[in-house]
UniProtKB/Swiss-Prot annotation:
The gene is fni. The lineage of its organism: Archaea, Methanobacteriati, Methanobacteriota, Stenosarchaea group, Halobacteria. GO terms for molecular function: FMN binding; isopentenyl-diphosphate delta-isomerase activity; magnesium ion binding; NADPH binding; oxidoreductase activity. Transmembrane segments: none annotated. Pfam families: FMN_dh (PF01070). This is Isopentenyl-diphosphate delta-isomerase. Substrate binds at R12, K13, S99, Q100, R101, Q164.
Length: 360
């Protein structure tokens, strides 16, 4: 990476953080409003005895809630990551990092600290790293292992963000040979691989390919939350790149709604994280009833993180209380039981799923 590329990468990270904090980057239409869990008027449970803990890739988590990959790669993100990591450690949930490409390719101690601070703040938490699928084609296994070692990661997320790349003036739009790269790394890496989208969802067909490639988990990151094409549209406007702005705006609402993507992915893989517009513990409960193992949130943790770890801990506590309430009124004493709860599918999500199923 050249010095110019290095500066560009770091500046892009800072741009993204500022835009997410200051601009309208939310979409709608996760599909969770179309999912109705069947109420149990006689749950025969002690609320205080409800156990929301899970085993995830051999690690015990206190609740099926993930702090999704967001930040890293700019010194402005260090304190945010410190707060998120401390909260993950205190509450016993999982946390993902943003792309570690900058940490691998830039010779900058402040950039590196934006990543390493996470393990320093959370020595025992489940922390997973992050690289792009496009980078896997370029890196040998030793380079990928460096990303793992950088934060003593328990797993590595491989993100798929080709729509975002297509809307960036400097984007990498060569999508070839990524499945082979993912399979190569899945076979050789020392930790499990989680493949995640970045706001546009994973289809059943793609989930099937990834399952065959040997990945350990899928994170659907569907439509309905933060829109990265929308974020890039703001960047393009500031960079006087009207065509990229137009494309980013046009595809702002593009993707598979999170609920539908979850349904498709759980039919192909037995370890699925539902993210993308997840905002409450009830959303997490619905995702689990659809078959997900856990639910993930990113942007809802960003503002609390700027206020410090206690604010993040409070937000996690709210989510767990909402989840436990949903478990109580569905008669679910455990997450395994919540996965078996009956639900009714309505509206556009039902239409989407029925049409997709009938076309197979």
């Amino acid at each position: 990476m050249t010095a110019q590329d290095s500066t560009q990468t770091e500046d892009r990270k800072d741009d993204h953080l500022q835009i997410v904090q200051e601009r309208d980057v939310e979409t709608t239409g996760t599909g969770f409003d179309d999912v109705h869990l069947v109420h149990n008027a006689l749950p025969e449970l002690d609320y205080d005895a409800i156990d929301p803990s899970i085993d995830f890739l051999g690690h015990d988590l206190s609740a099926p809630i993930f702090i999704e990959s967001m930040t890293g790669g700019h010194h402005n993100t260090t304190e945010i990551n410190r707060a998120l990591a401390r909260a993950a450690s205190e509450t016993g949930i999982a946390m993902g990092l943003g792309s570690q490409r900058a940490g691998l390719e830039l010779d900058d101690e402040r950039v590196l600290e934006s990543y390493t601070v996470v393990r320093d703040a959370a020595p025992d938490a489940f922390i997973y790293g992050n690289l792009g699928a496009a980078q896997l084609r370029e890196y040998d296994i030793e380079m990928v292992e460096q990303a793992v070692e950088m934060i003593d990661a328990d797993a590595l997320a491989v993100h798929l963000n080709f729509l975002q790349e297509a809307t960036q003036p400097e984007g990498d739009v060569d999508g070839r040979n990524c499945v082979a790269a993912i399979e190569r790394v899945s076979e050789a890496l020392s930790v499990p691989i989680i493949v995640k989208e970045t706001g546009n969802g994973i289809s059943g067909e793609t989930a099937r390919e990834l399952t065959a490639a040997g990945v350990d988990a899928l994170d659907v990151a569907g439509k309905g939350g933060t829109t990265w094409s929308g974020i890039e549209a703001y960047r393009a406007a500031a960079a006087n790149a009207p065509r990229q702005k137009q494309i980013g705006t046009l595809f702002r609402e593009w993707g598979i709604p999170t609920a539908a993507s979850t349904i498709e992915c759980v039919a192909e893989h037995d370890c699925v994280i539902a993210s993308g517009g997840v905002r409450t513990g009830l959303d997490v409960a619905k995702a689990i009833a659809l078959g997900a193992r856990a639910g993930g949130l990113a942007k809802p943790f960003l503002k609390p993180a700027t206020d410090g770890p206690d604010a993040v801990i409070e937000r996690v506590g709210d989510l767990i209380a909402e989840l436990r309430t949903a478990m109580f009124v569905t008669g679910s004493g455990s997450i395994d039981e919540l996965q078996q709860v009956e639900y009714v599918l309505h509206g556009k999500t039902r239409e989407y799923v029925e049409q997709r199923t009938s076309s197979e």
